[in-house]
UniProtKB/Swiss-Prot annotation:
This is Ammonium transporter 1 member 3. NCBIfam families: amt (TIGR00836). Keywords: Ammonia transport, Membrane, Transmembrane, Transmembrane helix, Transport. Ammonium transporter that may be involved in ammonium transport throughout the plant. Induction: Highest expression in darkness. The lineage of its organism: Eukaryota, Viridiplantae, Streptophyta, Embryophyta, Tracheophyta. GO terms for molecular function: ammonium channel activity. GO terms for cellular component: plasma membrane. Gene3D superfamilies: Ammonium transporter AmtB like domains (1.10.3430.10). The chain crosses the membrane at residues 15-37, 50-72, 98-117, 124-146, 166-188, 209-227, 255-277, 305-327, 337-356, 377-399. Leaves. It holds the Pfam family Ammonium_transp.
Amino acid sequence: MDSSWEASVTDSINAIYLLFSAYLVFVMQLGFAMLCAGSVRAKNAMNIMLTNVVDAVVGSLSYYLFGFAFAFGDSNPFIGASYFALKDIPSSSYDYSFFLYQWAFAIAVAGITSGSIAERTQFTAYLVFSFFLTGFVYPVVAHWLWSSNGWLSPNSTYLLFGSGAIDFAGSGVVHLVGGIAGFWGSIVEGPRVGRFDAFGNPVKMRGHNATLVVLGTLLLWFGWFGFNPGSFNKILVAYPHMADQGNWTSVGRTAVTTTLAGSTAGIVTLFGRRLLVGHWDAMDVCNGVLGGFVAITSGCSVVEPWAAILCGFCAAWVLIGLNILALKFKFDDPLEAAQLHGGCGAWGLIFTGLFAKEEFVLQAYNSGKTQIIRPSGLILGGGWGLFGAQIVELLSIVVWVSLTMGPLFYLLQKLGILRISSDEEVAGLDISSHGGYAYDASQEESNARFYGEYLRMQQQ
């Protein structure tokens, strides 16, 4: 068989695999939209659904113009400076399939942040921070970890602590970035009207539709099989000295570790919340499942299945504990996004530094070559190199996102374009900003049903 023909078939199969993974990750936007809509009150459902669409359309332009260049362009270990507006793509390193896959990741970050500031944010602010986050803040972090010359990258020439940080599919790059950005947005805006009473006690504001939350969670679960296993980028790569194994083996194992971590976190949250609140809560369980997925995303390709179970177990308690602290400090995040994506994402980075297996690290980053020595998890005898790199990544992301997104939200607040007025918040963003409710038939007769009625009621 002609070798060039074989190479073409291999490249085609790998391109199809990457494109299919990109489609799966994009399906997560639908999952996010359903999850967010069900987690807010009915009077804000249209608003939160629209923000998910905006994340995709605004993120498309910002990532095309600047984001991909900052993330994967050749320049220095901090930020890229080529491939602006996809100039010189396809290249020897990247093609259009890779861009599409990375774009799907970028818009997920903005979706995470949107959840933290739901039900009280002006629509203009969404446009501004979504463009900035997907076009600059997130791509810089992606460059650190995922480009070939990033200063934290496990693929760079000069490895931090002889290891580089392992964040295979983005517990830090995607979820911690989105969670910390959402944290600062929520801090600057403050709690929703009525979230805490005059004595500082929390007032329950449940989402209006558990059905949407459950369906959205299952869609996200489905999409995660593109998010984590898809991060190999290529499936048809054979490992030397292992004729029957290749990336296809690691892809399958990654799907298994992802499933086990999310499932374990869901079960622990089910019983943990039952002990705390006295009933079985579907919404809490869904967030627990997602917390497990977020945590395993960093080390999904480099840990054993049994370790993934431990990852999910701890992720559930991280989420439960952070939610308790959030109420104690009067922190209001309608979707628990900062706690879920920020807290569980941070745990995922630490977990990888503890339990990464050297054999799997070589498979994920060196195509299974055995003559290379790679630091592995601290608990598995791999020394402090990888663990130290994971801690540096965690702290660097927190500092970077805080220094960029914190001032942005503060500036938007000072300009008066971040938070809506109390009257608009009480009426709901759907009627005050979008011309009508998402569910007209479910509204009480005393409430305005259309934007014109809302204006007349405001003038009375």
